[in-house]
Structure formats: structure tokens, C-alpha cells
From Swiss-Prot:
Keywords: Ribonucleoprotein, Ribosomal protein. It holds the Pfam family Ribosomal_L17. One of its GO terms (biological process) is translation. One of its GO terms (cellular component) is cytosolic large ribosomal subunit. Part of the 50S ribosomal subunit. Contacts protein L32. It comes from the Bacteria. The gene is rplQ. InterPro entries: Ribosomal_bL17, Ribosomal_bL17_CS, Ribosomal_bL17_sf. Belongs to the bacterial ribosomal protein bL17 family. The lineage of its organism: Bacteria, Pseudomonadati, Pseudomonadota, Gammaproteobacteria, Oceanospirillales. GO terms for molecular function: structural constituent of ribosome. SUPFAM superfamilies: Prokaryotic ribosomal protein L17. PANTHER family: LARGE RIBOSOMAL SUBUNIT PROTEIN BL17M (PTHR14413:SF16), RIBOSOMAL PROTEIN L17 (PTHR14413). This is Large ribosomal subunit protein bL17.
């Protein structure tokens, strides 16, 4: 029976899965938008959202906990100096998953994962003043 077994295995070993989500979470923190498959995006929420909640209160202990989960100094710095203060008043739901069609090679459903209140960068072309 499958009672109370949460999480997906993705046909990977536990170390590979842990490494994959560690890398994806660090990329999400650094770029604030990544493209991945829908099941990986849904599973990434379980890794990334607690990190942002941790970053809302800046302390040495919280930074060390975040570093133990991300293993990227740049990502931890950005998480605590930019992203944590941005979501100070939001009680959760920091990520948005936008479906974006199928991957050409194997028709896997793809999605963008983005931070909810990320700053929008204007395109530099076609600016007429």
C-alpha cells in the first residue's frame, strides 16, 4: 500500500534527486525564473518555498540552514538580502507555475517557475520617445 508516501521519485536515486532540486532551487533564486517539466516544478515548490520563509528572518543560523540546503553562497546572499525582505508581508505562496506547452523531443509538459512579485525587466528594443 502507498499510504502516507509523499513526493515523486523521478526514476532517480535519492542523492541524484537531492542534487537536482538543490541545483534547481539555487537557479530559481539566482534567476527568479526557470523552465522545467510540470512534475519537477510542482516538486520544486516543496524545496524552494520553505527557503524563502527561512529568508524572511535574517540570522546567522538561518543563513547556515539555507546554505546547507542550497550549497551556493551567491544564492544564499541574494535570498537573504533581496528575496527575503521582498516577501516580508506575504504568508506563503511565493512561486507561480505557468504551463508553457510540450517539449518537442518527448512531449513532456513544460512549465515556467517564477517568483510571484519579481521585478519585470523591460525589453530594450522598439522604444520610441
Amino acid at each position: 500500500m502507498r499510504h502516507r508516501k509523499s513526493g515523486r521519485k523521478f526514476n532517480r536515486t535519492s542523492a541524484h534527486r537531492k542534487s537536482m532540486f538543490r541545483n534547481m532551487a539555487a537557479s530559481l533564486v539566482e534567476h527568479e525564473l526557470i523552465k522545467t517539466t510540470v512534475p519537477k516544478a510542482k516538486e520544486l515548490r516543496r524545496v524552494a518555498e520553505p527557503l524563502i520563509t527561512l529568508a524572511k528572518s535574517d540570522s546567522v543560523a538561518n543563513r547556515r540552514l539555507a546554505f546547507s540546503r542550497l550549497r551556493s553562497r551567491d544564492a544564499v546572499t541574494k535570498l537573504f538580502e533581496e528575496i527575503g525582505p521582498r516577501y516580508k508581508d506575504r504568508p506563503g505562496g511565493y512561486l507561480r507555475i505557468l504551463k508553457c506547452g510540450l517539449r518537442p523531443g518527448d512531449s513532456a509538459p513544460m512549465a515556467f517557475v517564477e517568483l510571484v512579485d519579481r521585478p519585470v525587466v523591460e525589453a530594450e528594443g522598439d522604444n520610441e520617445e
